[in-house]
C-alpha cells in the first residue's frame, strides 16, 4: 500500500513541505531561525488567545485587567510574561533571520525576500499595537508619539491621525481598535508565512556557499527536523529562563504606572526592538524627513537585490564585504543604544552619525566592496 503521506491531499502538502523536502546538505545553524520564528508565532498566538479571554479593551479597566491576569488568573502571570518576552525572542530571531539572509545573499530569491519584508512590517505593526494594550504610561505616550508621526504627511496628515485615533486624542476608541487589529494581524501573518514558504519551496533553500546545490540534496526529515528540535529546545530554554528569572528585564518601568494624559514621562521610548529605527527617526530634525528615514530604514532591505553587484552570492568568500556587514551590525547596535538615551549631547551627534552611516554602508560601501572584490579576482 502506498504511504498515506504521499497520497492524501492534505498530508501530501505537509510531506512536500516538511518531510520529503529536498534540502541542501550543508546549511548551518543560521538556517534554524525560520522554524524558530514559526514556533514563536504559534506561542504568541496561543498565549495571546488566553490573554484575550481575560483582557478588557476599555481605558478605565485595561490596566487593572492586566493586573487581574497577573494576580488572579491561574498561571496568568506566566502567560502574560511568556507573551511579552516571547515578542522579544520573536524579534531576536527575526533580526538574525534577516541578517543571515543579507550575509548569505538569500535576497536574490526576490519573491521570498519581498514577502519577508512585508512580514517584517506586519510583525512590527502587531508588536507596536500590543505594546499599547496594557495602557501604562509608556503604552499611552508611545501610541501618541508614534501615531502622531502621520501628521507629517502633507495635506491629509492631521485628518489621518484623527481617523486612526477615532477622536482628537488617543482614547477608548484607539485602544479598542488597536486590540482588534492586534488580534487579527497574527492570523494575517500566518497567511503571509504560508506564501513566504510557498515562494521559498519554488526555488529551494540557499546554502552558506551560495552555490547551486541540486546535486547534493538530502530529505528534510529526519536530518533537519532533529536540528530544528535542538534549536527549539534552546529557544524555549532561554525564553523560560527570561520569564522566570528576569521577566521585566526588557520592559519599561513606566508601564507599571497607569496611563495619565496629563503627565508626560521624561523619556518616551518604544520597546528595545524598535530602538534602532526610533534613533534614525530622532536623528532627522525635520518631522516628515524623520518619518521617511524611519520607513526607509526597513524598506531599504527591498533595494538589496538591486544593489548586489558581485559575481558571488554569499559573503562566505568575500572578506571586504564581510567587514562591511559586521560594520552594519555594529552600527545597528549603536543605534539601538542611542534610541534608549535622552535627546541631549553627545547622544544626538552619535545618533546622526550612526544613522548616516547605516544608509551609507547599505547603499554605497557594500556595492563598492563587491566591485573591489571582483576586480581583485579579475572577474570584472
From Swiss-Prot:
Co-factor binding details = Binds 2 heme b groups non-covalently.
Q: Which GO terms describe its molecular function?
A: metal ion binding; ubiquinol-cytochrome-c reductase activity
**Entries under Pfam families matching the protein:** Cytochrom_B_C (PF00032), Cytochrome_B (PF00033)
Lipid bilayer topology: Multi-pass membrane protein
Annotated residues that bind heme b b562 are located at: 83, 182
* Compartment(s) of residence: Mitochondrion inner membrane
Query: What is the additional note?
Result: Heme 1 (or BL or b562) is low-potential and absorbs at about 562 nm, and heme 2 (or BH or b566) is high-potential and absorbs at about 566 nm.
Q: What is this protein called?
A: Cytochrome b
- Species source reads Beamys hindei (Long-tailed pouched rat)
Amino acid at each position: 500500500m502506498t504511504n498515506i503521506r504521499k497520497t492524501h491531499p492534505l498530508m501530501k502538502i505537509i510531506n512536500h513541505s516538511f518531510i520529503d523536502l529536498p534540502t541542501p546538505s550543508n546549511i548551518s545553524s543560521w538556517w534554524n531561525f525560520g522554524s524558530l520564528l514559526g514556533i514563536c508565532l504559534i506561542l504568541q498566538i496561543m498565549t495571546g488567545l488566553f490573554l484575550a479571554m481575560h483582557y478588557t479593551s476599555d481605558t478605565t479597566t485595561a490596566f487593572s485587567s492586566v493586573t487581574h491576569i497577573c494576580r488572579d488568573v491561574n498561571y496568568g502571570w506566566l502567560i502574560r510574561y511568556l507573551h511579552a518576552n516571547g515578542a522579544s525572542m520573536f524579534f531576536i530571531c527575526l533580526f538574525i533571520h534577516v541578517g543571515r539572509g543579507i550575509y548569505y545573499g538569500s535576497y536574490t530569491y526576490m519573491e521570498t525576500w519581498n514577502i519577508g519584508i512585508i512580514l517584517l512590517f506586519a510583525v512590527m505593526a502587531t508588536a507596536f499595537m500590543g505594546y499599547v494594550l496594557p495602557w501604562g504610561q509608556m503604552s499611552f505616550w508611545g501610541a501618541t508619539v508614534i501615531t502622531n508621526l502621520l501628521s507629517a504627511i502633507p495635506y491629509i496628515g492631521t485628518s489621518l491621525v484623527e481617523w486612526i485615533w477615532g477622536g482628537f486624542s488617543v482614547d477608548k476608541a484607539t485602544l479598542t481598535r488597536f486590540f482588534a487589529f492586534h488580534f487579527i494581524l497574527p492570523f494575517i501573518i500566518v497567511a503571509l508565512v504560508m506564501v513566504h514558504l510557498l515562494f521559498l519551496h519554488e526555488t529551494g533553500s540557499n546554502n552558506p556557499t551560495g552555490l547551486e546545490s541540486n546535486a547534493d540534496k538530502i530529505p528534510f526529515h529526519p536530518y533537519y527536523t532533529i536540528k530544528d528540535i535542538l534549536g527549539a529546545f534552546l529557544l524555549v530554554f532561554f525564553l523560560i529562563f527570561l520569564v522566570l528569572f528576569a521577566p521585566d528585564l526588557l520592559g519599561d518601568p513606566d508601564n507599571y504606572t497607569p496611563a495619565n494624559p496629563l503627565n508626560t514621562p521624561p523619556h518616551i521610548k518604544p520597546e528595545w526592538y524598535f530602538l534602532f529605527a526610533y534613533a534614525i527617526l530622532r536623528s532627522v530634525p525635520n518631522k516628515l524627513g524623520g518619518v521617511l528615514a524611519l520607513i526607509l530604514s526597513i524598506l531599504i532591505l527591498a533595494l538589496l537585490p538591486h544593489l548586489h553587484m558581485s559575481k558571488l552570492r554569499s559573503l562566505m568568500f568575500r572578506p571586504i564585504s564581510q567587514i562591511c556587514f559586521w560594520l552594519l551590525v555594529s552600527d545597528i547596535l549603536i543605534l539601538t543604544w542611542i534610541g534608549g538615551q535622552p535627546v541631549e549631547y553627545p547622544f544626538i551627534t552619535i545618533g546622526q552619525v550612526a544613522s548616516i552611516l547605516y544608509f551609507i554602508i547599505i547603499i554605497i560601501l557594500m556595492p563598492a566592496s563587491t566591485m573591489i572584490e571582483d576586480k581583485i579576482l579579475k572577474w570584472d
